[in-house]
A protein has these predicted regions:
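N-terminal amphipathic/basic leader segments beginning at the initiator methionine
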Residues: 1-24
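Alpha/beta enzyme core
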Residues: 2-4, 16, 29-34, 40-333
Length: 333
């Protein structure tokens, strides 16, 4: 029941900053941020990602400085995405399971130097395959589910053995969460968390990311519609989330983020589990480009966009704005 005007004047509570802050329903904090980074082989290597202004691929020695900044700012988690040399890419993505590969080495080094910083790794084959798909192909080019899951399981075990805190399967193969969870349990990795990319859509917003990890050229004109979700579907997202929770996921994710805030809200309302969203490369690139052209206020739209995730029900956000947002948040704390 609503009290009629003039007894009720909603603008009363909007009049002053103190009262606006007092009744604010949702707030963003540094604890909500996960910072995705792109890591290269070698030393002293830094490569700007042209389609993602302000984002760079970098070698481990330079990434250590970024990790230190994350710790200083209080960002809880860094998410690693590998840029794999073309000579290591094969149709079967075998490099993904190499215990001496790039990601296991980076994980072990980061955890040795920054034990309090949460480290998350991507469980997927597209950075490692010569065709740019997230799985193994049959003769017709169709992604084979079950044998792909076997490779993903080994990839997750390799990362867990290196000391990773969170494995995040982004592949969208059926049954992979259960297989990975059971394998982790069997090998004694009972504390390794799983953040499942549960509702990952076949979106046009991923373009800059594929440039960043170097899979765009391999993928070519192919798509991922046979395993990633149809953007027109909402109920299906709930079924996917339910399956992943039943199979042992500790946290679930919706990707992309801003175009799918309705899915975030439905997932949170339905399951009440830790729910995350990924503000993907295309979302980031749009806001950065508009700000660079003077069409939008950079900091204002950055913070408003992140707050929108919280209002929709997200417990946390993967965002390339994490460092900038954390600086804003800590400056006002």
């Amino acid at each position: 029941m609503t009290t009629p005007f003039p007894l009720s004047r909603p603008r009363r509570l909007r009049r002053d900053d103190f009262s606006r802050r007092l009744v604010r329903e949702h707030a963003l904090s540094v604890n909500d941020l996960i910072y995705p980074v792109f890591v290269l082989e070698g030393e002293n290597r830094r490569e700007p990602v042209a389609s993602m202004p302000g984002v760079e691929r970098m070698s481990l020695d330079l990434l250590l400085n970024v990790a230190q900044e994350c710790v200083k700012l209080g960002i809880p988690v860094m998410a690693l995405f590998p840029v794999i040399s073309s000579h290591l890419k094969t149709p079967d993505g075998k490099e993904a399971t190499n215990p001496k590969g790039l990601i296991p080495h980076v994980v072990a080094t980061l955890k040795e130097n920054f034990p309090s910083l949460g480290i998350m790794t991507d469980i997927a084959l597209d950075p490692y395959t010569s065709h740019g798909q997230d799985g193994l192909l049959d003769e017709s080019g169709y992604i084979l589910n079950d044998i792909t899951v076997e490779v993903l399981k080994q990839q997750a075990l390799t990362h867990a053995a290196a000391g990773v805190d969170i494995v995040a399967p982004s592949d969208m193969m059926d049954g992979r969460i259960g297989a990975i969870r059971q394998a982790l349990e069997d090998q004694g990795h009972i504390h390794t968390r799983i953040m499942a990319y549960s509702a990952k859509y076949a979106s046009a917003f991923y373009g800059p990311f594929r440039d960043a990890v170097g899979s765009a050229a391999n993928l070519g004109k192919s798509d991922k519609k046979t395993y990633q979700m149809d953007p027109g579907n909402s109920d299906e997202a709930l079924r996917e989330v339910a399956l992943d929770i039943a199979e042992g996921a500790d946290m679930v994710m919706v990707k992309p983020g801003m175009p799918y805030l309705d899915i975030v809200r439905r997932v949170k309302d339905e399951f009440k589990v830790p729910t995350f969203a990924y503000q993907v490369s295309g979302e980031y690139a749009m806001l950065k480009a508009a700000a660079q052209n003077g069409w939008l206020d950079h900091d204002a739209v950055m913070m408003e966009s992140l707050l929108a995730f919280k209002r929709a029900g997200a417990d946390g956000i993967l965002t390339y704005f994490a460092i900038d947002a954390a600086k804003k948040l800590t400056a006002h704390s």
